[in-house]
Amino acid sequence: MITRLSELFVRTLRDDPADAEVPSHKLLIRAGYVRPVAPGVYSWLPLGLRVLRKIENIVREEMNAIGGQEILLPALLPRAPYETTNRWTEYGDSLFRLKDRRDNDMMLGPTHEELFALTVKGEYSSYKDFPVILYQVQTKYRDEARPRAGILRGREFVMKDSYSFDTSDDGLKAAYHAHRDAYQRIFGRLGLDYVIVAATSGAMGGSASEEFLAESPTGEDTFVRCVESGYAANVEAVITPAPPARPIEGLAEAVVHETGDTPTIATLVDWANSAGLGRTVTAADTLKNILLKVRQPGGDWELLAVGVPGDREVDDKRLGAALEPAEYELLGDADFAKYPFLVRGYIGPKALLANGVRYLVDPRVVEGTSWITGADEPGKHVVDLVAGRDFTADGTIEAAEVRDGDPSPDGAGQLVSARGIEIGHIFQLGRKYTDAFTVDVLGENGKPVRLTQGSYGIGVSRLVAVVAEQQHDELGLRWPSAVSPFDVHVVIANKDDAARAGAEELAAELDRLGHEVLLDDRTASPGVKFKDAELLGVPWIVVIGRGWADGTIELRNRFTGETQPIAVTDAVASVTQAIG
């Protein structure tokens, strides 16, 4: 069936939306693919829905190819299963919560590990039923604090989530790698540039976890990689290579110095290099201690101190990942007033440990390393405080920023950073959820076997924006043929009746051959039609213009910009060959 622009429910815009920040947000609205309804909530118009459905179909094909079976669970969920796993609390404010008329707590589902585990428990009881992979393509809901970038980070989004269930860890690993391969095929078919990185599991739980990140300067996720080895990881998952412990014997004794008004690392370093210490001091020789209060889900606030080398900032994402599922806040004025042993700007390990404050340090703070740090009195710091001799931390924490040039955890070279957009995440959950719901089946030996579970997600609606981010140009969208709303866009740029009739005939013949045709039969000017064709982004554009009288039309490649004249008599064959 030919789609006529004169009848299509679409309105293009010439100007970018005032609140749009990234190219995909601007272009998808300008081209009439989506429309905003509320912050983080969008309507899908016909063009956008066509692209979304094509991506969904690619995902379904590859999921079916690894033995996945599609089901559909409700988005409106009861509280009880999520209370059992504590995620009703762990998800905090990101959950959309509501009550029914009987005052029962309900929620809009952000993810479905619990429900899939319960579904399998209710249907299967023997090892003979496994392995099994179930999946759904469904709308999810998360109450993002700051929805942004259009459909890249919304509060309502379409996601493919699949779950594997096996009777052994080997089976889980096989399902995990099957999904990993399927995801690579999916993203390859979409023509995406992406990288697979080691990741943290967060509130999902489990052991092994990897993210698929589409490379983009507008991405919210920072990842690092080692060019020499191919190592790649989300910054939250980078493990700092700890230096070897150093001998303590013979090291200078710790001495407290009057340092004056030196509450910052910069002022402390200036003092140290003018104090006659006999060496040049840099920020890396200092140890700064950050005070937080942390609270486990359902628990009370507790103090936590984090010590990092003074040349490093604390990375909020790494800190949050290290503390998850606990929430945390920096101490404020009222908190410092409550704990007089905490002298802001001069906090050191001694007072922290003496007052029972949990103290975690960067992995670089190893036994035998010597530091300049606070002496717990105004205007005083201690020089040559040695880890393992003068203080012993309660443990380590991966909270310091990761920088370009840092050594790769695999020892093969240096790290370089880039930005990306998360498009997929795979987890080996293990038995976190099957333990919670006692999902056992009868094993081959007649004894109960606890199932092991994997979880695998793809942001389907987000992929629409990601393709737009990677493939657009200054003129508009450029859709790969696999997901383009149409195969070819036929533009009638000649008012001659014969030319219009020829365009109709060409469109009809292409349609008969099974191609999806968008025909611009509007009475608008050629300039308006050309701009819209470039904005809408169909990969092949056929222009029926002034050359019609000479027996030629134009075939334009939206990706390369190349235009070639083709004979009217060969038009169907030439366009079909180009479309492939």
From Swiss-Prot:
Q: Does the keyword Mitochondrion apply?
A: no
Q: What are the annotated GO cellular component locations?
A: cytosol
Gene3D superfamilies to which the protein is assigned, alphabetical: Anticodon-binding domain, Bira Bifunctional Protein, Domain 2, YbaK/aminoacyl-tRNA synthetase-associated domain
Enzyme Commission number(s): 6.1.1.15
The record's annotation in PROSITE patterns points to: AA_TRNA_LIGASE_II
From the UniProt record, list the reaction(s) this protein catalyses: tRNA(Pro) + L-proline + ATP = L-prolyl-tRNA(Pro) + AMP + diphosphate
Entry keyword set: Aminoacyl-tRNA synthetase, ATP-binding, Cytoplasm, Ligase, Nucleotide-binding, Protein biosynthesis
- Which EC class does it fall in? ligase
Location in the cell: Cytoplasm
What GO molecular function terms would the record report? aminoacyl-tRNA deacylase activity; ATP binding; proline-tRNA ligase activity
Please list every transmembrane segment annotated in the UniProt record, as residue ranges. none
| GO BP terms in the entry | prolyl-tRNA aminoacylation
| Classification via Pfam families | HGTP_anticodon (PF03129), tRNA-synt_2b (PF00587), tRNA_edit (PF04073)
Q: What does this protein do?
A: Catalyzes the attachment of proline to tRNA(Pro) in a two-step reaction: proline is first activated by ATP to form Pro-AMP and then transferred to the acceptor end of tRNA(Pro). As ProRS can inadvertently accommodate and process non-cognate amino acids such as alanine and cysteine, to avoid such errors it has two additional distinct editing activities against alanine. One activity is designated as 'pretransfer' editing and involves the tRNA(Pro)-independent hydrolysis of activated Ala-AMP.
Q: What HAMAP family does this protein map onto? A: Pro_tRNA_synth_type1 (MF_01569)
Q: Which family does it belong to?
A: Belongs to the class-II aminoacyl-tRNA synthetase family. ProS type 1 subfamily.
- Subunit structure, briefly? Homodimer.
Q: What is known of its domains?
A: Consists of three domains: the N-terminal catalytic domain, the editing domain and the C-terminal anticodon-binding domain.
The protein depicted here goes by the name: Proline--tRNA ligase
What gene is behind this protein?
proS
